[in-house]
């Protein structure tokens, strides 16, 4: 996470797009480059409020973020071990999440996120993903991840849900 009064200013230096107009509960996709203009990584930036953001990427960039943050009034924290993420992609993903009582999930706009309750657990769901199809990413406490996985797969007999790892997702990445 990136927090502090310079959080937005720091992220604007870090990535190749301007996030001055980002609103809470919005997500942006971005690239970040080093000082020589070479691509370091890509990922998503989640805005919780004016001074609180989450950066999600496939590679570990913590040291580079910390080095880049010198001179900014920000706190950078690696929250990788305190949050779990499940990508749930495909044309039936909205329907299945709705059947799990993620009420109004169908109203969640692309590149936005909100809080939903599934199995009496509060989770964050973003309408993001890189499969090119309708999809969501579900964010929860690590202790909730197994139950969330089981809830999703409880529909396997009717909807033929398939588990796929990051390598498989990278193959369909657009």
List PLM regions with ranges.
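Basic, glycine/lysine-rich polyanion-binding surfaces/domains
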Residues: 1-174
């Amino acid at each position: 996470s990136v927090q502090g009064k310079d959080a937005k200013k720091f992220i604007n230096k870090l990535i190749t797009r301007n996030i001055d107009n980002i609103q809470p509960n919005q997500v942006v996709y971005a690239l970040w480059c080093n000082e020589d203009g070479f691509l370091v990584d890509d990922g998503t930036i989640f805005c919780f409020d004016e001074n609180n953001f989450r950066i999600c990427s496939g590679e570990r960039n913590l040291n580079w973020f910390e080095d880049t943050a010198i001179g900014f009034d920000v706190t950078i924290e690696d929250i990788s071990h305190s949050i779990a993420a499940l990508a749930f992609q495909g044309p039936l993903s909205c329907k299945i999440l709705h059947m799990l009582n993620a009420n109004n999930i169908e109203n969640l706009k692309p590149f936005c996120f909100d809080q939903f309750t599934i199995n009496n657990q509060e989770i964050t769901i973003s309408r993001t993903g890189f499969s090119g199809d309708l999809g969501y990413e579900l964010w929860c406490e690590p202790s909730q991840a197994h139950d969330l996985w089981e809830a999703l797969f409880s529909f396997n007999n009717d909807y033929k849900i398939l588990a796929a790892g990051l390598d498989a997702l990278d193959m369909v990445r657009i």
